[in-house]
A protein has these predicted regions:
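Short beta-strand segments at enzyme active-site cores
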Residues: 20, 56-62, 144
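Short acidic, Gly/Ser-rich segments with clustered Asp/Glu that frequently serve as metal-coordination loops
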Residues: 24-29
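Glycine-/proline-rich flexible loop or hinge segments
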Residues: 30, 61-64
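Short glycine-enriched, charge-decorated loop/helix-capping segments at active-site entrances
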Residues: 31-37, 67-68
């Protein structure tokens, strides 16, 4: 039985799209990102639709002291991902969750965001952490089922497992093409 979600803590009705860790270094691991081309197409579709709908887009990039050092080639956003537009946010993180030790929550609050759409890498790491933390913080969360992935050899199983587990935790899991960019996202 899923845990009851906390009340929304006066979250607004605005929507934001979180684009998590689409970084070159993650696409160039020895085990390739599962369905990389499809994931990039679906993420770009979400970004385009968000921009057309006037929805905040937040690009999140992981920084560490090894292969994702800030400002190195591997740290950069994937060249096939649509680049951030002038009004898009960029958040740099050092932990799995985009909320931990960043100003993401403050930025979302300033924009009266209550609904989060999430896509990114990696399914069982940073995507999982962002979804669960956002639910715990009272956001209404929708994960694009076909716009997150992993470079694990077990990626198909992990994606299916985490789509199920996150849905049980209160995350709405939908194919990217079925996500409705309105304030009724959580009811789609």
């Amino acid at each position: 039985m899923p845990k009851p979600k906390p009340s929304p803590r006066n979250r607004g009705n605005a929507i934001a799209l979180l684009v998590i860790d689409f970084q070159i270094g993650l696409f160039e691991k020895p085990t390739p990102v599962y369905h990389a081309a499809e994931i990039l197409v679906n993420a770009n579709n979400l970004i385009q639709r968000a921009h057309l709908a006037g929805i905040s887009v937040v690009y999140i990039q992981h920084c560490n002291d090894s292969f994702l050092q800030k400002d190195t080639p591997d740290w950069q956003l994937h060249q096939e991902l649509l680049p951030p537009a002038e009004n898009d946010l960029r958040i740099y993180k050092r932990h799995g969750s985009a909320f931990r030790d960043t100003y993401l929550e403050q930025e979302l609050e300033a924009r009266h965001v209550g609904d989060l759409l999430i896509c990114g890498l990696v399914t069982h790491g940073c995507v999982r952490a962002a979804c669960l933390d956002a639910c715990q913080m009272g956001y209404r969360v929708t994960l694009a089922a076909d716009a997150h992935s992993s470079f694990s050899k077990d990626a198909p199983r992990l994606i299916e497992e985490w789509n199920t587990r996150l849905a049980q935790a209160g995350v709405q899991v939908l194919p990217a093409g079925e996500i409705n960019f309105t304030t009724e996202v959580a009811l789609a």
